[in-house]
Structures are given as C-alpha cells and as structure tokens.
Design a protein with these regions (language model features):
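Segments of small-molecule ligand-sensing domains
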Residues: 315-322, 336-400
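N-terminal secretory signal peptides
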Residues: 1-13
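Extracytoplasmic ligand/sensor domains, especially the bilobed periplasmic-binding protein
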Residues: 101, 105, 112-215, 263-289
Length: 425
C-alpha cells in the first residue's frame, strides 16, 4: 500500500467546496505590495499578479537562476504580445535564497499581502512542502515546476515537472538488462532523495534487480571518501546518484579521482538540471544515463528557437537552459492558456480550465495536464554522457503519462479533495 503524508488545509467533501469563488513591453519585476486583476482576487488593479519564488542565491541558485530567467522571458513575451485577456502580468519575485523559512514567510506575504493570482515556488522538495500547507490554508493556486520524487495529490497544487514513473520506470530496466542487476544508491538525505530512492527500490524489485547498498548524504556535505570506499567494496553494476546542491556535486570529481569512471550511473537530476556535463571535467560524468523531458541540446525547430530567444535575452548571464527552466517557461504559458480558456483570473475557474485536459506546445514537445492528478505528461528521451561529456540521445520514449497516482493510491482530484503526498512503500 502507498504510504501517505498530508499537508494541512483540505478536509472531506467535494473539492469545489474548498476553492475560491471571488467574483507592457516587459514584465514588471517587483517585490513590493500591490493589487491584482479585479476578477481574480478582487483587489481592483488591472494587472495579473504572478508570485514567483526561485532561488537566485544560496545552495540551489545554479538551477533557480535558470528558472527565474526562463519565467521572466515568458512573462516578457506574453506582455509584449498583449498580455492575458488584455492585462499585463506583474511578476513579483523576491529571492528566497534557498532557505525554507524564507519560503514560508514570502509565500504568506505574496498570498496575503500581494494577493497574487497564481504562485510559482520552489526548487527543493523541502521548500515545496513548506509552501503547500500555506497554499492549502489560503486556497491558493500553486504551480510547482520542478522535477521531483512524485506522489503529491493536492487540490491546489499543479506539478509540471517529470516524476519517477516517467524517468525511472522506463529507463532502469534497460540499464539492468545492459549492465547487470546489482545497484548501489547514494541520495540526498531529505524527502526528494529518500522518496526517489524508494522508487528505485520498487522498480528494482519489480524487475528482479538488487539494491546492494544505499546511503543518504546530508545536504551541504561534500566529502565522499567513505562513500566511495563502500561503493568499491560492493562493486555494483550500476550506481544511482540522487545528489542535490553545490556541495554534493563534489562527488563526481572524487569518484573520477578514485578510478570509477567506467561504472554506469543512473539519475533523475544530473545534466538536465545542473548541466554537470558542461561544468565538470571529463570523465566525471562518463556513462551517466538519465531519462529527461528536456535539455537545451534537443535538436528540433521549436526548441532551437526557444534556446535562441533565451540566450538573446540573457546573454552572458545565461550559462545553460535546463529542464527546470523549460518547465517554468511553458508553465507560464500554461497559466496564460488556462486563464484565456476560463475567461477570468478567478482561481476556481482557472483550476477548472487546468483540469480540462489542457495541452501546451512546450519546447520539449506537445504535452498535457492530467486532470485527476494535476501532473503533466512529458516527452522522455534517454540521454547518455560519454567519456568526453558529449551527450547522446539514445532513445526517444515518446509521451509518458504520470500514471502512478491514479493507479496506485487512486488520486482523483476531480472527485475528492486531497492534500497528501503518497510514497511507493
């Protein structure tokens, strides 16, 4: 049976009982207090208020800056083309600095003082879980754009990043077939790493593979000497790495120095988020495999246009355009499309539009919001880095639905309100 953890704020009854029923050339990037569009939260201002909390400093800024840049680009493009329903977006984007307490404080401020029409917030799962109880308490539309460990079934939260059944379930069996059944996992010691590791355990058991070792590394730790010794002692066929943040990234150079270049690696985060294949000296990432929904190297006309616009806008400030940045970009257009379909920024009606199987033309390809679970389908490609850190898209798996919440715990937010995170344990 799936294990269930709950965020505060949602009780029993139909979900509609709990939803709100309130009657320029560039984005306005601000952190001051102001109103929002009259038919949304009812402040009377003729702008759409978009709250954005992305880490532009601190432990997770490497990816947070990408996300902030991509969302700013989307807002600017939308405003340059007439806004949404003729209204410009005002993007209110204070820096949470990768600190959980700041996420709590700033979320309350954006919701209660700035009265945003929509909230985007968070890189780390710990920050998402700090925000969700506040979102549910205030019945606030919240879009979380990160790849994550999955399992959130929440009436007010829409998760637009990839989840384990899209990244692990289709990829790990291929690696086991090619390299062998013995797997060693090292993961960040918080909810993302712990739950994603449990996904690897679940899939490994289903395919007859073995988890021969598992370690959880506290955030901020950068010395992996004992971990590398343990890996060498177990001699696995595959190493799963679920490491997060600037300090934990030191593992890859230490692994290279220990002579483990030939050990195949599986992950859900590297290259697509932190562009380690660009930042680290070869062959630190050699034989890294990951199922990605997006990397800037995807060679399609649509994506090449997106990449060109991104670098034209940000110039030397832009170092890479990763999957989380792409998610933030298309999720801004997803909100635009939902508001236009609803004909209003009223959050109840925007949620109904998002739950209508809404589709979006993302840089990765055409994808769709799953109404019952509030998660996106994604186009998944298998990527491998060679000894020189050249990447190869070895297989296009096509569009994969976020099926586990429906088929496992039975999440159906059209029928039953919820605020839980379920785990495959």
């Amino acid at each position: 049976m799936p294990h269930k953890k709950s965020a505060d704020g949602i009780g029993s009854g139909t979900r509609r009982q709990y939803l709100k029923t309130a009657g320029g050339a560039t984005a306005a990037i601000a952190s001051m207090t102001a109103g929002c569009l009259g038919n949304g939260n009812g402040n009377g201002d003729d702008v759409i208020r978009m709250g954005v909390l992305e880490d532009r400093s601190g432990e997770f800024s490497l990816t947070g800056i990408q996300k902030y840049h991509a969302q700013t680009l989307a807002v600017e493009e939308i405003n340059e083309n007439g806004g949404i329903l003729g209204q410009e977006i005002e993007m209110i984007a204070p820096d949470p600095q990768s600190e959980v307490d700041r996420y709590r404080d700033l979320s309350r401020r954006l919701i209660n003082e700035d009265q945003v029409d929509v909230l985007y917030a968070g890189f780390a799962s710990s920050t998402r879980e700090a925000v969700r109880p506040i979102v549910n308490e205030n019945q606030q539309l919240y879009i979380y754009t990160n790849q994550y460990e999955g399992g959130v079934c929440d009436s007010y939260t829409f998760c637009t990043g990839a989840v384990p059944e899209q990244q692990i379930s289709p990829v790990l069996p291929q690696l086991v077939d090619e390299f062998g059944p013995d797997i060693y996992t090292i993961a960040a010691d918080y909810n993302f790493g712990q739950i994603t590791a449990s996904w690897y355990r679940t899939v490994a058991e289903e395919i007859g593979a073995n988890i021969v070792g598992e370690e959880f590394i506290p955030l901020g730790v950068g010395d992996f000497g004992s971990t590398i010794n343990n890996i060498q002692e177990e001699d696995p066929d595959i190493l799963v790495t679920l490491l997060v943040g600037a300090e934990q990234a030191a593992f890859y150079d230490q692994k290279r120095a220990a002579g483990l270049d030939d050990l195949p690696m599986s992950t859900t985060v590297n290259m697509m988020q932190g562009y380690e294949h660009r930042r680290f000296d070869p062959p630190s990432l050699a034989n890294m495999y990951v199922g990605v929904n997006y990397m800037e190297e995807i060679d399609t006309e649509r994506n090449n246009s997106f990449v060109e616009r991104y670098y034209d806008r940000w110039g030397d400030e832009a170092e890479y355009l990763g999957s989380m940045a792409q998610n933030s970009y298309f999720s801004t257009y997803l909100y635009k499309q939902a508001v236009e379909q609803a004909g209003t920024t009223d959050q109840d009606e925007v949620i109904e539009a998002l739950e209508d199987g809404i589709e979006i033309e993302a840089p990765e390809g055409d994808i769709r919001m799953d109404p019952e679970t509030h998660h996106m389908s994604h186009i998944i490609r298998v990527v491998r880095a060679d000894e020189n850190h050249n990447i190869e898209f070895t297989e296009n798996l096509g569009e994969i639905e976020p099926f586990w919440l429906r088929e496992g715990p039975g999440c159906d937010l059209l029928e039953e309100p919820d605020s839980s995170q379920y785990e495959p344990i």
